[in-house]
């Protein structure tokens, strides 16, 4: 019998951004209008020069222009738009230039603070440049002197957008057309981190200088209850506390409230910037040391070290009258203050699974 060895996991597959999809479909539709070419695939150049070919679902003339569509393939990334049909409609204009329109399922900017002005379709700068560059080159190749009106659509985009940060950012009516490299890196979470940064930018631009960064729904509810903060001031950071703290170096606010489950706050207290279990773990011996610093005896410390979960460790300490929640928040506060600018006032809340506050450190002046 042969020895069994663990299989090597297959490498994760990269995908292409909505910006790449919009570029490919716009180019195919424009090429049909200017050259009569009905394509089933189209090749585009990504921002760093790599050429990729994308398969088209359709490429056809319409009453007043042409349209082409492709299925968004995010590779192995758990992207909300994976498998969605993205299609672009192109009309020719007499005057040179590119005019962008938000079609079905693509949002419109309604709040200041984003990279696009209020009223603009949520087609980000890099996708706009990609589309413009490809259509400009096509015009030069065909001798066309006019311009293009490009309407980007995502089938079902209105519903998909509700699963993103767009409504909170003031991007209404659908999704954003995104991408800086044209490529989706599996589990890079780049889009999520970008939405955290945008959330801070939008809050500050709209005059909200006290923000609460929360790990999930329960912590958001706690911050609403404690401060009655509006939606725009609540930053859904998930596990990416580092994305919040580092961005505040560039875009400082007056006050930052950090709120999360006790276990995640204990990871922050230990100096972790990514609170996901893939990148950091609960350190029960460290919890025992912190408990010792505020009076836990040897028996209690041993019980904390032997706990099954951070919540159990907290319950053991609380039953003994040791305020472990506050002590963990104090260490988390110290670490957070070491990252953000000195002018940013910081406080930290730890909550239980029901949203009850089990620890707090820091007080606003």
From Swiss-Prot:
Keywords: Cobalamin biosynthesis, Methyltransferase, S-adenosyl-L-methionine, Transferase. It is an enzyme of class 2 (transferase). It comes from the Bacteria. One of its GO terms (biological process) is anaerobic cobalamin biosynthetic process. GO terms for molecular function: cobalt-precorrin-5B C1-methyltransferase activity. Its EC number is 2.1.1.195. Pathway: Cofactor biosynthesis; adenosylcobalamin biosynthesis; cob(II)yrinate a,c-diamide from sirohydrochlorin (anaerobic route): step 6/10. Transmembrane segments: none annotated. This is Cobalt-precorrin-5B C(1)-methyltransferase. It comes from Pseudomonas fluorescens (strain Pf0-1). The gene is cbiD.
């Amino acid at each position: 019998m042969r020895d069994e060895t663990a299989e090597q996991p297959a490498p994760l597959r990269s995908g292409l951004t909505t910006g790449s999809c919009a570029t490919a479909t716009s180019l195919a539709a424009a090429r049909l209008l200017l050259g009569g070419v009905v394509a089933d695939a189209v090749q585009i150049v990504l921002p760093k020069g790599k050429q990729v070919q994308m398969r088209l679902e359709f490429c056809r003339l319409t009453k007043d222009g042409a349209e082409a569509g492709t299925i968004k393939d995010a590779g192995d990334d758990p992207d909300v738009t994976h498998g969605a049909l993205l299609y672009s409609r192109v009309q020719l204009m007499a005057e040179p230039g590119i005019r962008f329109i938000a079609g079905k399922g693509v949002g419109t900017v309604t709040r200041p603070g984003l990279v696009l002005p209020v009223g603009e379709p949520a087609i980000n700068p890099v996708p706009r440049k990609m589309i413009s560059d490809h259509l400009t080159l096509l015009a030069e190749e065909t001798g066309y002197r006019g311009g293009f009106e490009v309407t980007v659509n995502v089938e079902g985009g209105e519903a998909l957008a509700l699963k993103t940060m767009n409504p909170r950012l003031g991007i209404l009516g659908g999704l954003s057309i995104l991408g800086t490299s044209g490529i989706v890196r599996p589990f890079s979470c780049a889009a999520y981190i970008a939405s955290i940064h945008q959330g801070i930018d939008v809050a500050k631009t709209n005059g909200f200088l006290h923000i609460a960064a929360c790990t999930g729904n329960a912590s958001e509810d706690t911050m609403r209850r404690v401060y009655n903060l509006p939606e725009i001031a609540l930053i859904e950071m998930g596990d990416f506390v580092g994305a919040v703290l580092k961005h505040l170096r560039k875009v400082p606010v007056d006050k930052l409230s950090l709120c999360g489950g006790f276990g995640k706050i204990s990871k922050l207290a230990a100096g972790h910037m990514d609170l996901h279990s893939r990148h950091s773990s609960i350190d029960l011996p460290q919890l025992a040391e912190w408990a010792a610093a505020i009076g836990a005896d040897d028996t209690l410390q041993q019980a904390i070290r032997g706990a099954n979960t951070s919540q159990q460790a907290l319950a053991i300490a609380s039953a003994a009258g040791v305020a472990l929640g506050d002590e963990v928040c104090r260490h988390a506060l110290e670490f957070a203050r070491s990252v953000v600018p000195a002018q940013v006032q910081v406080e930290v809340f730890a909550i239980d699974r029901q949203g009850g506050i089990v620890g707090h450190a820091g007080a606003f002046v």
